[in-house]
Amino acid sequence: MYQDSGCSSSSSRRGSSSAAAATSTAATAAETAAAAAATTTSSSDEETLETLTIITTTITDSDIHATTTTTTVIASGTATTAAAAATTATLATLATLASNSDIEDSSPVESEDSEECEYIEIDCQTTAQEGTSPSGGSSSSGNAVLLQRSSNNLQQQQQQQQQQQQHLQLQLQQADERLLRKIGYIASRVRCLSKYYGDFRLVNPYSARRQRRQLQEILLRHSIFDPGKEHQRAIVLAAATAAIAGPLAAIDCVCGSSSISLEAVSSRSRSSELEDDHHEQDQVQEEQEQEQHQGDTEDNEEEQEHPSEKPERTDIEEEPPPAIAVTTTTTATVRRKSSSSSTISGTATVSGSVSVSASASQSFCSNNINLLEELLIQFYEEQDHRSNLTVIRHHHHQQHQQHQQQQRITNNNNNNNNCNSIQNNNNMSNPAATAAATATPSVEQPATSGTTNIHLQPTSLPDGSDNPRRRRASDCSAVQAALQNQLHCITLKNNNCGKAMPFHRGSCGAAGEHLLAANSIANRATIILSKSCSNVDGDATATAATALSSTVGGGIGGIGGSIKMRASATDIETNALNGARDAIVASNNGNNGNNGNNGNNEYSILQLNNTIIQCHFNDDDFRALVKDLKRKVEYTERMNWLCLSKRPLGPPHRKSSLPKHQEVKRRFLEICDTTFSEEVRAALRLPAFDSYEWSDADVIHLMQTMFVELGFIEKFSIPVDTLREWLYEVYKHYNEVPFHNFRHCFCVAQMMYAITRQANLLSRLGDLECLILLVSCICHDLDHPGYNNIYQINARTELALRYNDISPLENHHCSIAFRLLEHPECNIFKNFSRDTFNNIREGIIRCILATDMARHNEILTQFMEITPIFDYSNRAHINLLCMILIKVADISNEARPMDVAEPWLDRLLQEFFAQSAAEKSEGLPVTPFMDPDKVSKPGSQVRFIGLVLLPLFEALGELVPELTELIIIPVRIALEYYRRLNDAQTKTRKSVADSNTSATSDSNSGTIDSNAAMVSTPGGASDKLSLDKGQGNSQGSGGGGGGGGGGGAGGGTGSGCGSNAAGSVSPQMPRSGSGISVKSRRSIPSQKSASRTSVDEPGGMASELHDLPEGSESGDSETATEVDVAEKTSKFKVDTEGSSNRSKSSHSTSRKSSREKRPSMIGELCSSGGGQRIRNSYGNIHGYHSNRCHFGNNRAVSLDQYSSAGNNRRLSDGLPQVISDSNVFYGRHNRSSTETTVAVGNPQDTNANTNHPVGCQLKELLARTEADSDGEGDGNGREDKKIPLVIPSMPQLATSSNGNISPTLVVTEQILPSNGSTRSSASSGRGGSGVPGGSGGSGMPGPSAGSGSSWKSRLRQFSDYFSFSFDKSNKRFGSTRSSPCPGSNSSSGRTNNNANGLGENQDGLGAGGGIKPGMCCTTITNSSGSTVKGETRGGTAGAGGGALTTMTTGNDAHQRHRAYSLDVPGMMRYSSNDSSRHPSNNTLQSAGGGAGLTTGLEVTAQRVPPSLSVEMGLASGSSSEAGPKI
């Protein structure tokens, strides 16, 4: 029960005093409290919404006992008249009742009692203590005299108040009704909130039923003017229907003479406290009655009451001398309606000084309360809930009166408050001693040990002035218990409110609940302004409450700033008690003149707002609370979801609070001067160091140790304090995401530190470079959101827009790093010269930007080129080495022991999967290597380590052999470990693939062996055509040359020509064959990541990767590495510079740059458009330039460009052309583009891929195709001229030996986003196997039209085989999965479907049958020549008679709509066609074959009927390699 802060019987005051008094008067006080509680309870129930009654009374006796006690008290009042006794009893009773009512509110009976008494309810528990003796036995006699006077005064006042109440009855009734309705509305909203939040622990004591009952009580109370009856009814209800006449009479008496009661109370001695409690109860009852009357009359007779208050104040002032002799602490809680009673209780409160304290406290409290109410306003105004505590009613006049009283009593109040606040704890513990102490500072101060129940209603000051302030929120927060009387401010963090709230009663009622709700929603860590937000009722009672609150909270600004809220509830209680006395006096005075404002809720609210503003800026504590509360609200997603806050949601990764940071800083500063042991420092130099064994503060300290150990602090005069502040700020600016958090930053820095020590980089590079490296490592992921650049670019986030899709995160990290350094206290480089700082800045930016994995191949290629001639005196070489070093440190987890590295892998996958989920939910292209449905931990690790990490480490090891044992060998061990795991999975997948090729083709694992992949047989019916490496004329050809081509070309191995030795491999390497052509293998980087522009090492670094598990090839979207996808993603964007001939070797426009040198990667420029950017259906700029120009080797390492050191290197750069990427990213968009009609031009590419008019001889095309397949194909990827093609029925084309050449259908530019990997299986097989029908690469009998599904599955198979694992998008769709191309049936839809299913033209493309002009063979050939309206650039499909082998030149690769996946752009590295070199082998030169689109049919972008089988004519081999010949 809120008896702690509330007034227990005077004897039950907080602290020892309360204990002692309680002990002495336990029974009596209990009874008194019960009676008072009963009375108060009924009023509280009614006023619950309006005021919060805080019951400090510990007595839980029934109201009947309280009544009896009250009667007894009256009788026992020493030397007190019956009236005085009644007054005293009333006060005690009121206090008790208030506490009891609060306590009892939970019970129906209590609620009833409180209903009646709430308005009247003022608990004035006075502890009469002599200043000298703890016990007021001697002072009780003095109290008797005072009580007599008080009784007389109270009687007179009561009569006046009754008259006033009669005048104001109607007005009050209406005001109450409005108030309750508003409160009910608020409460209903609160209940609604509680429904949404399971953790919303708002205990709403004001149920709808109770609110209705309260309303009825209000009506009844106003209809019945006899306060005695009302009080009696309340008591009866509280006491379980036990009627008590004595308390009622006492209440009447009290109402009659509230001032006398105050005097009597003040004169009471502690010995009489027990009796006083009873008397107080009686008085409280009387006061409550008077308050009711006054509440009725307050509005109209407010001014009148002021005069009465003045006399009362005079009486009180007169009383002070007795009060001096006997110190009595009385807490009066007055309900709005019971303003008169509150006034009475205030008057009854001991002395003028007390009254002053009360009034001062009240005014102060009201200000505080206003502030608290402001919280509600803030919450609900923002919520568009404009209730704004309208429930709060201030009686401005009463407050004014109270304020005046407070002013008059200010000095005393200040003293009382100070003493009380100081002595509250003591008083609570030792009421008598406290009373004495209090009395000493202020004779008039009653012993504050007594506890009182005060409602948080603003009450008029004794002087009649309005309460200038409401209770401070700080007061509430600081002292929960004490504030319970006032505000029942409870911190929800402890969920205390749950217990307390049921007992809260206040006129604000639901408004208090509002605050509770807001608090609770704000994580229950803020103050709970329980019901009484300094009730708007301007009642004297409210004033008393306000006085108490002000006393508790501290002196009112004007009254006494000295009065400060004590953290202890005891202090608050003591102050509250003193304030209560003053408040009682003030309330008596206020009741006389302040009733006028009673019904003016709007005015009260306005006043409240003004007060809030004033207090808000004057109360630091409250401001802090408000700020904290607002922060919690603003950062609470649920609050935002409810529109409770207009602040947009912050990133989910953002930290919402800093308490942890502060604690970490505190801990760090405590240990920062210590030194780690030698063992720790030695361990810090090893990769096995595990940061998760250390706390955050320790980790920061370890970072400091790195600077110390490397000597940077001394060498560069870095201030230690600045370094520490900088490290702490860096810590703060890392987000709590699974992987890219502060611990990751430490791991990278620690690995750099270990490498620096191991390789002696200080001597190799110099101190400054090492400093740059260490700082770069620490800052390299600052403020990382947990979503990588791929997401940023695809989602067009603020960072992507800000940095134009160019390494958005890395640029952001740099920006944050230097923003931190802008702060002098964090600028560790402050002592450097400007030139040196500029060099440092340049170096840090270079290093951080190098961590963008999209630049991996570019950087690695360049580094490998300079390694043989590395010169430590060459600035460019040093810069490149620094970039390699930070890249190694950044991805060095696998160099750590498995027990350290494995958890980091799990965290990384957690972050990846979260991003994948976000991409799916937002409709963005799903990054293949992050899709939990497509990747497995072993496979992902094998690909990453084998294709990305190990080559990088080994490249560094060649220059710095000291690192071989430190990091390279552990990485090899890790690779072997994951490879074994992956092999088992791969075998399983293969078996599954064999059983269901088409299904496996879609599967991410790439389990399908090229053998398993079945090219649709010429008989379209057969979905599968197992390709034997040697089958068909083409070595790779399976059932069709195309099949071979598919197997070989697509696989890259066993290219259709068989020229690729790997051709034989293709069957075994489902993905590897398709994903990594032997050619591509020749370049490790390319092999490493099919999608990533493989760095094509001049040599055959690829050889290292030949071993990769078959499933590990990066060709599939699932198998694409982060580098591949990142390159593709960024390259569209980065290539915004155009496919400008960045790479010297190849101009995107002229694919001439020898493809041979660089296997066509997705990176190869697909620019059929010569660097034109294709706009996605989204219209994104991402629209991946078909021409993504490769960044020339000579090009500086720009963020955009990945210049490769050679044309072949450009390969890796070639990725730049993520041609299909546009599709890749926005497959959907691409779809639309695919849908667009494309005038297919006959690309006049030398590549067989180039479609020629039907007039072209197939032989020519075949020859070209073969040449291209051989890699001879135009090394210069010529762009096919875009020629609108009309495809005459081309049955004859089907005859062409190459199925690929098979008459090209007009490609609706629905070019299936053929992965570059999608080399049209049609790639012309040398022996154009079965050119007729299935001949050639198509592997599909041209004419046979299989069911659309069969040809679709074939396309899938082909795409899987041919699509390089990079064809993420294809993969995504299953590489064969239909690429997003909507229109294309199967193959057309899928770029991946390399013309699979071409053989099937359901439309009746019979072999040799004329192709329906309407049909478009969407071939994805990259042939740039073909113009794609939409995105598809040129693939023209040669529809063979019957065998529609698709051959689109490479341009189409862009058109692949694979775009859903971020996977490698449609072009496989190997498919030069993807790279926009149509000629590239990728295009399967089949275009050269019948591919020459027969002009004549104008292709309209239309979805190819499923019957159309499109053959992707993508040469499997990278252009650099001879494409497999069909």
From Swiss-Prot:
Q: Which residue range or ranges hold the PDEase domain?
A: 664-985
Positions with a binding annotation for 3',5'-cyclic GMP: 740-744, 781, 890
Q: Which CDD domains match?
A: HDc
> Bias category Basic and acidic residues: which stretches?
270-282, 305-314, 1125-1136
Biased composition (Polar residues) is annotated at 441-462, 1065-1093, 1470-1486
UniProt lists compositionally biased (Low complexity) regions at 1-43, 324-348, 401-440, 993-1005, 1139-1148, 1314-1324, 1341-1350, 1375-1397
* Active-site residue numbers: 740 (proton donor)
* Residues covered by region (Disordered): 1-48, 266-348, 393-476, 986-1170, 1265-1284, 1314-1351, 1372-1406, 1469-1496
Amino acid composition bias (Gly residues), ranges on this chain? 1033-1057, 1325-1340
Please name the GO terms that the record assigns under molecular function: 3',5'-cyclic-AMP phosphodiesterase activity; 3',5'-cyclic-GMP phosphodiesterase activity; 3',5'-cyclic-nucleotide phosphodiesterase activity; metal ion binding
Q: Which residues take part in binding Zn(2+)?
A: 744, 780-781, 890
Gene Ontology BP term (one):
cyclic nucleotide metabolic process
InterPro entries, per database record: HD/PDEase_dom (IPR003607), PDEase (IPR023088), PDEase_catalytic_dom (IPR002073), PDEase_catalytic_dom_sf (IPR036971), PDEase_CS (IPR023174)
Q: How is the cofactor bound?
A: Binds 1 Zn(2+) ion per subunit. Binds 2 divalent metal cations per subunit: site 1 preferentially binds zinc, while site 2 has a preference for magnesium. Tightly binds zinc. Binds 1 Mg(2+) ions per subunit. Binds 2 divalent metal cations per subunit: site 1 preferentially binds zinc, while site 2 has a preference for magnesium. Binds magnesium less tightly than zinc.
Pathway annotation from the record:
Purine metabolism; 3',5'-cyclic GMP degradation; GMP from 3',5'-cyclic GMP: step 1/1
Please list the reactions this protein catalyses.
3',5'-cyclic GMP + H2O = GMP + H(+)
What is the uppermost EC class here?
hydrolase
* EC number(s) given by UniProt: 3.1.4.35
Superkingdom of the organism of origin: Eukaryota
Q: Which cofactor does it need?
A: Zn(2+); Mg(2+)
Protein task:
Specifically hydrolyzes the second messenger cGMP, which is a key regulator of many important physiological processes. Highly specific: compared to other members of the cyclic nucleotide phosphodiesterase family, has the highest affinity and selectivity for cGMP.
By sequence similarity, the record places it as follows: Belongs to the cyclic nucleotide phosphodiesterase family. PDE9 subfamily.
> What name goes with this protein?
High affinity cGMP-specific 3',5'-cyclic phosphodiesterase 9A
- Organism of origin is Drosophila melanogaster (Fruit fly)
- Please state the gene responsible for encoding this protein: Pde9
